[in-house]
Amino acid sequence: MSNNGLDVQDKPPAPPMRNTSTMIGAGSKDPGTLNHGSKPLPPNPEEKKKKDRFYRSILAGDKTNKKKEKERPEISLPSDFEHTIHVGFDAVTGEFTGMPEQWARLLQTSNITKSEQKKNPQAVLDVLEFYNSKKTSNSQKYMSFTDKSAEDYNSSNTLNVKTVSETPAVPPVSEDEDDDDDATPPPVIAPRPEHTKSVYTRSVIEPLPVTPTRDVATSPISPTENNTTPPDALTRNTEKQKKKPKMSDEEILEKLRSIVSVGDPKKKYTRFEKIGQGASGTVYTAMDVATGQEVAIKQMNLQQQPKKELIINEILVMRENKNPNIVNYLDSYLVGDELWVVMEYLAGGSLTDVVTETCMDEGQIAAVCRECLQALEFLHSNQVIHRDIKSDNILLGMDGSVKLTDFGFCAQITPEQSKRSTMVGTPYWMAPEVVTRKAYGPKVDIWSLGIMAIEMIEGEPPYLNENPLRALYLIATNGTPELQNPEKLSAIFRDFLNRCLEMDVEKRGSAKELLQHQFLKIAKPLSSLTPLIAAAKEATKNNH
């Protein structure tokens, strides 16, 4: 990674700026901003059953690493609980039957047309259940681990679809369901943040309507007397894990004492400056007295942390996974009832500011993609899936350095977004296999990287201004999103995007493979990002 700064004497021309900011709240009704949703929907891509299955575990971690396994609490496999929802779909009338009332209300306001519902009722139910599961899951993030020893784990969860004559048959799909509290859910994607005066961002998208809880159950639908053919029977069986006894507060404190550093952080760090405040803690920048390094410190009141057990796991994992392209965990301390976590600090802000305020050329985009792929190759080789790749989670140094953040415990270093606990962020960057609740692996990060590359081209991801549920539907059914002006891109860049945004997971490139792609060979030095960072910071300052 290059850290070369610009020669102050060679003043480059001002970087190209976007004419208007593309950041629009979710409530925007301007039809001119709907760039992606109006195109006709292609046929639902044929789903190929994956050979490799990734079993996801929060606390058990990578079972191939015995040392980590010993240090992390274990969670049992799902067992002895079955929850069934029966929903019917009449392909003649195009109406769902037996749908929970809250789901029906959500669907009514989703902007998913009747013809779209009739074309793919399965996708409609997939996104409704996905949205519902994210509404009920805890908003705190944690890393996902792939477990090679469990690739052949077969869940008994199935989704069976029977169709009437007017609708082509959809094959049964086997999927891995998640427990809201203990199993690793797909990532909850935060909404596009507003500009703020620091690298830390806050939510702007309003909370969505209330969805039905996971425990909503309906009776199986009986065929109505006046129907000549029964409605489609869409039956979802879900399992829930048995809960293991949680660690007591004293046990958690005892474990934390064995992990954190001994000593007074107020003597090691000086020049504290508050830069963020959240429900669970306060974020400061500070200076390491010994090295002069600027750091970010989050001070968290442990009594206000809903999942204290996860904190232990994340510190252990962060301590063991360090990389030049990751915003790294540096240290931690117990100060009274507070846990202080020290992380690297990057003063350049997030990539979001750059993509929304300036125009990047292909060489600069290639440089960012290369740095992100280096971080992903490292994480994936250590059986860690980031699950939340987007411009908001890429931080920049003033020298142009590019680092991935907001994975694992890094999620806790950002001030909590005020609405995150009461809403589900729209997953613009999320891979189709996640939205449709299939088993997934590290390549979900590659899809998200492809969407982030579109951000760098167009200033925003596809479907940003769509209703959240419709955005989910389009991700599940549209396949690879279309670019606004694909003819303006080079052939090698288009090929790189196609490799990232391949619907067939087995054909999608891995981080290791994509690091060899020809597109990355045109990458400019990282110092070429410095003028863009400076221009974005100036534009952000002028907007307030």
Curated annotation (Swiss-Prot):
Keyword flag Nuclease: no
Pfam families in the cross-refs: PBD (PF00786), Pkinase (PF00069)
Highest taxon of source: Eukaryota
Catalytic activity: L-seryl-[protein] + ATP = O-phospho-L-seryl-[protein] + ADP + H(+); L-threonyl-[protein] + ATP = O-phospho-L-threonyl-[protein] + ADP + H(+)
Biological process annotations from GO: actin cytoskeleton organization; amygdala development; apoptotic process; branching morphogenesis of an epithelial tube; cell migration; cellular response to insulin stimulus; cellular response to starvation; cerebellum development
Sequence positions bearing Phosphotyrosine: Y131, Y142, Y153, Y200, Y284
Span list, region Autoregulatory region: 70-140
All residue ranges annotated as the CRIB domain in the record: 75-88
SUPFAM superfamilies: Protein kinase-like (PK-like)
Modified-residue entries (Phosphoserine), positions: S21, S57, S115, S144, S149, S174, S198, S203, S219, S222
Region feature Disordered, mapped onto this chain: 1-79, 150-195, 209-250
Consequence the record notes for mutating H83L: Abolishes interaction with CDC42, leading to strongly decreased activity. Reduces NMDA receptor-mediated synaptic currents
Residues the record marks as active site: D388 (proton acceptor)
Positions carrying Phosphothreonine: T84, T184, T211, T218, T224, T228, T229, T422
Effect in UniProt of substituting S144A: Decreases activity
Gene Ontology MF terms: ATP binding; collagen binding; gamma-tubulin binding; MAP kinase kinase kinase activity; protein kinase activity; protein kinase binding; protein serine kinase activity; protein serine/threonine kinase activity
CC per GO annotation: actin filament; axon; cell-cell junction; centrosome; chromosome; cytoplasm; cytosol; dendrite
List of residues binding ATP: I275, G276, Q277, G278, A279, S280, G281, T282, V283, K298
Subcellular location: Cytoplasm; Cell junction, Focal adhesion; Cell projection, Lamellipodium; Cell membrane
Cofactor(s) the record lists: Mg(2+)
Protein family (similarity comment): Belongs to the protein kinase superfamily. STE Ser/Thr protein kinase family. STE20 subfamily.
Function recorded in the entry: Protein kinase involved in intracellular signaling pathways downstream of integrins and receptor-type kinases that plays an important role in cytoskeleton dynamics, in cell adhesion, migration, proliferation, apoptosis, mitosis, and in vesicle-mediated transport processes. Can directly phosphorylate BAD and protects cells against apoptosis. Activated by interaction with CDC42 and RAC1. Functions as a GTPase effector that links the Rho-related GTPases CDC42 and RAC1 to the JNK MAP kinase pathway. Phosphorylates and activates MAP2K1, and thereby mediates activation of downstream MAP kinases.
Name of this chain's protein: Serine/threonine-protein kinase PAK 1
